[in-house]
Amino acid sequence: MQRALKAWFVPVLLGVTPVWADTVACHIIYGGENFSVSAQPTAEPYKVKGEKIGRYFEFKAVYATSPADLAAISIYVYGTSSGESVLIHQAKFASGIGNDAAPWGFTGFQYVYEPSKSSELQYWCEKTP
């Protein structure tokens, strides 16, 4: 019993997320292609990098776990047609949210439009063990 408690407390004290923590998996459709972006729990949300999706989008999923009062899952979609990343969609969910909007995870099925090129990106995200 004492060994099991040490195995749980040591990662928490070091600020490391246990390997059994949930992750966020986002499924993206753009231009007839499927993309996947995953987000691991992190205590440093500003260090998470976005992923380029096609020519005109960048997608970033952030699963912030600490501090506990600010823990959340944030989804950002940027338009990149001008050469710079411009935020065009943002969604935020409580970190304890479940996949209640099944079959489309906790976000439901979302549509995002890039205004200058009339491009459409679709996505949905789910928590996975």
Explain the meaning of each model-derived region.
Residues 16-21:
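N-terminal signal peptide c-region/cleavage motif recognized by signal peptidases
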Residues 1-9:
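Bacterial N-terminal signal peptides that target proteins for export
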Residues 22-129:
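Cysteine-centric segments in proteins
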